[in-house]
Amino acid sequence: MLGKYLAQSAGYPDKLLGRKGFRMIEMRFLRWSVIFALVISGCSIEVAQPSVQTPDSIMTNPGTSATNDTTQIPVTWSSLNLTGKLIYSMGAIEKDVYVIRVLSLDLITGQVTTIYQAPNSAWVYYVSVSPDGEQLVMSFSPPPGTDPEVVQALYVMPIDGSRPPQLLFQPQIREDQYTQAEWSPDGKYIYYTHVNYQFPIDPNRVYPLYQIFRMEYPGGQPQLIAEEAYWPRLSSDSTRLTYISIDPLSIKQQLIIANADGGNAQEVSLSGSYIPDIKDAPIFSPDEVSILFSAAVPTQSRQPTWFENLMGMRLARANGSVPSDWWSVPINGGELTRLTHIQAPSLYASLSPDHRHVVSFSGAGVFVMNVDGSELTILLPNPDQFIGTVQWIP
């Protein structure tokens, strides 16, 4: 089912969408001519990841380099005195074609520069910047038929767009998919999530088996960090890891903190009047005494959200996620604090270099807020409800 594949390719788990949600996604993307007709053949694999080819030995690339096109947008957030740049992916309908770009926004000048434009019918989801600000790693699905060996894999490219993306390593088999790639702040490792929707075959399993790996960059080999887990994020000193674990039989989620190598994994207990079942995109707070994460809001009658009122738009309930808000919990566990009341889908956050602000990508737009959720300000619209990521660099 195309809608289900597109949701999975975006890195959002099946349980976040109902049957109607998959169908609405399918209809919307068919209309936009983003057709991912991927034929997956049945086979089994070993759990352990094999040794991988290095980028020097792999010639595969998505084939389209940077355009270096620039546009200017009003700096409506000038009163906040924000500095640095946002690196993000964004999709939009242009002349009946869905175009996906990796972009850079200068927060001082409002200049938007295209780093990379994906070929038609390709898909870019997760984009992460190396700590030295020189390279990008992204989760990329090539256009159907262009690379029979890749459904969704990790690619690296220079942030100046001087070379097209190069495959980080060759998937063992076509059905292996890779997403949620994060550079460790010390620059030594790339962490990522692996999933194969056909393996393992288990009639009792109602959810795919996600795994978190890391590999030294450049030239390292995959190292298994966590089973039944996704959404890896590192502390600023690269010593601790937070992620979401999920039981593929019961679909029960847990928020986890572990050592950077996956050892000493412990659940962060949540308490309060409302404990969300769906949790995504955890990130350490600037002072690293708490974890921020996206979670579904309590069930209630549908009302226009903050974004919808602001932008004069209505969002479909069937998107890559569910209406969510940012929450925080002490790193050692405790009562939840709801930071926002926006009910926006597909949230993903990054800290400002000075650790004073949080920028968040969402299916409704890109916004900035204080760490406590106050003074929320819209930066960029997302009218076509693209599911992407954002990173704030100096």
Segments predicted by a language model, with ranges:
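Intrinsic-disorder-associated, low-complexity terminal segments enriched in Asp/Asn/His/Tyr and depleted
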Residues: 5, 12-14
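Short, Lys/Arg-enriched N-terminal segments with co-localized hydrophobic residues
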Residues: 14-25
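Bacterial N-terminal signal peptides
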Residues: 33-42
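Bacterial N-terminal signal peptides that target proteins for export
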Residues: 24-33
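Sequence signature of WD/YWTD-type beta-propeller architectures
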Residues: 43-394
